[in-house]
Regions:
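Conserved hydrolase catalytic core segment
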Residues: 142-186
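The serine-hydrolase catalytic nucleophile loop
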Residues: 82-93
Length: 220
C-alpha cells in the first residue's frame, strides 16, 4: 500500500503547484491592470478635468479612468444630452474582469462637468469636436480607442465616427439607430406605450408646448 500512498502525495503536490502557478499569473495580471504609476492621474483616483474649447469660450469636462490596458481603451458616451456617466457604473462588474481600460465621461452640461447656460452649445457638431478634444487629452489612438455610445451617446458616436474614423479602432452603439425618423417611430410605438398613461400624457403636454425647461417636465 505504501507505493499508492507515495503516488497520492506526488499527485497532490503537482496539483498544488499548478494551482499556485495559476494564482500567481492572475495576480500579476491584476497588478498590471491596476498599475497607475505612469499615469498623470495616479493620485486623483483616475479623475481628470479636461479643458474644452468652444465657440463660447473654454470649459472643463469630467473624466475618470478605470484600469490600465494599452491595447483596449473604451470611452463611454452617455445619453441625453444632459444625462450623466452613472448609467454605466454597472460596467464595474464586467470590464475589470476582462482587463478593459475604460473612461467615464460627463459631457459638457452634465453633472460633474461645467454647465454653461448658452443653448447654442447644445449642437451635435460641437459635441463631436468636444469628444475629439477629450480623445486627444486622454491619449487615445486608433491602436486602442473604442467608442461606446448609448441613446444620444449612440448618435454622437456615429457622428464622431463619420468625421474622425481614422482615430478609432472600434465603435459600439447601443439602443440607437442611424435614423432619427426611425428612432422616433420606435419611441412612439415601443417605448411610449410602456410608460404610465398619465405620465405620458403630461410629457406630451409639455413637449407640444416645447416647454422643455419646465421643472415638472424635467422631473418626469
Amino acid at each position: 500500500m505504501k507505493p499508492y500512498f507515495l503516488y497520492f502525495l506526488i499527485y497532490t503536490f503537482v496539483l498544488t503547484a499548478c494551482k499556485t502557478e495559476i494564482k500567481t499569473s492572475i495576480t500579476s495580471s491584476n497588478t498590471d491592470y491596476l498599475d497607475s504609476s505612469e499615469k498623470d492621474d495616479q493620485y486623483l483616483g483616475g479623475i481628470k478635468m479636461i479643458p474644452i474649447s468652444t465657440p463660447k469660450g473654454e470649459f472643463n469636462v469630467w473624466t475618470k479612468r478605470v484600469g490600465n490596458n494599452p491595447t483596449m481603451k473604451v470611452l463611454l458616451l452617455h445619453g441625453g444630452p444632459g444625462m450623466t456617466h452613472e448609467i454605466y457604473e454597472s460596467f464595474d462588474g464586467y470590464f475589470p474582469n476582462e482587463g478593459i481600460e475604460y473612461y467615464y465621461y460627463d459631457q459638457l452640461g452634465s453633472y460633474y462637468s461645467d454647465q454653461p447656460t448658452d443653448l447654442s452649445l447644445w449642437d451635435l457638431d460641437r459635441f463631436v469636436e468636444e469628444v475629439e478634444q477629450v480623445r486627444v487629452a486622454l491619449g487615445l489612438s486608433n491602436d486602442n480607442f473604442y467608442l461606446f455610445g448609448q441613446s444620444w451617446g449612440g448618435i454622437l458616436g456615429m457622428q464622431y465616427a463619420l468625421k474622425y474614423q481614422e482615430n478609432l479602432k472600434g465603435l459600439i452603439i447601443s439602443n440607437m439607430v442611424p435614423s432619427i425618423p426611425d428612432y422616433q417611430k420606435y419611441s412612439d410605438e415601443v417605448l411610449a406605450p410602456k410608460l404610465d398613461p398619465d405620465v405620458l400624457k403630461e410629457i406630451m403636454f409639455y413637449e407640444d408646448k416645447e416647454d422643455y425647461t419646465n421643472a415638472r417636465y424635467m422631473d418626469l
